[in-house]
């Protein structure tokens, strides 16, 4: 049995958790999240507590047990305080701006790149940093990853879009790598 799956989730007073058929609905001050209960798992809702149970000895069901419990815990945290992911722009002339709800990136392409947020996701930009915010942790992380994918940090100068605090391993240039003079002078 999963150690994470066995842990009981404490539900704050301002959050309501209800069963709706084969779904769990989590409502809070920031919004509402709905998760389908995987086959083979049961969810017990009692006063301020949530418990996910797995009666099966099947390895696949036990693997989903811990995952689903973590997903519910993230939903409870998301509807109370929300989730954010911060990205940093590094490069000469790299800029980001919010136009309405869309994020507009000027990152060295011949055209500005526009990113439209999915439902429940908001962008804010300040001083070369892009903040992706929302109540669904998985959606926030996925949108941040897709923005980073547009222009990953390159290994020579580190120009591109990276997560806040991410370390980019830099490579030596050609002249340093072979021990020769810069520019290939003979």
PLM ranges: what are they?
Residues 2-65, 69-145, 149-186:
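N-terminal intrinsically disordered, cationic/polar leader segments
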């Amino acid at each position: 049995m999963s150690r994470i799956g066995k842990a009981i989730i404490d539900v704050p007073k301002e959050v309501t958790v209800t069963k709706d058929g084969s779904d769990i609905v989590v409502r809070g001050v920031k919004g509402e999240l709905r998760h389908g209960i995987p086959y083979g798992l049961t969810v017990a809702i009692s006063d301020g507590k949530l418990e996910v149970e797995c009666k099966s000895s099947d390895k696949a069901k036990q693997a989903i047990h811990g995952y689903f419990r973590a997903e519910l815990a993230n939903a409870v945290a998301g509807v109370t305080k929300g989730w954010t992911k911060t990205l940093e722009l590094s490069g000469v002339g790299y800029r980001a701006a919010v136009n309405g709800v869309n994020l507009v990136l000027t990152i060295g392409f011949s055209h500005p790149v526009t990113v439209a947020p999915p439902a429940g996701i908001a962008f804010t930009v300040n001083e070369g940093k892009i903040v992706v915010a929302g109540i669904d942790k998985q959606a926030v992380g996925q949108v941040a990853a897709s923005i980073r994918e547009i222009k990953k940090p390159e290994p020579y100068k580190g120009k591109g879009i990276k997560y806040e605090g991410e370390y980019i391993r830099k490579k030596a240039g050609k002249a340093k790598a072979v021990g020769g003079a810069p520019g290939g002078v003979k």
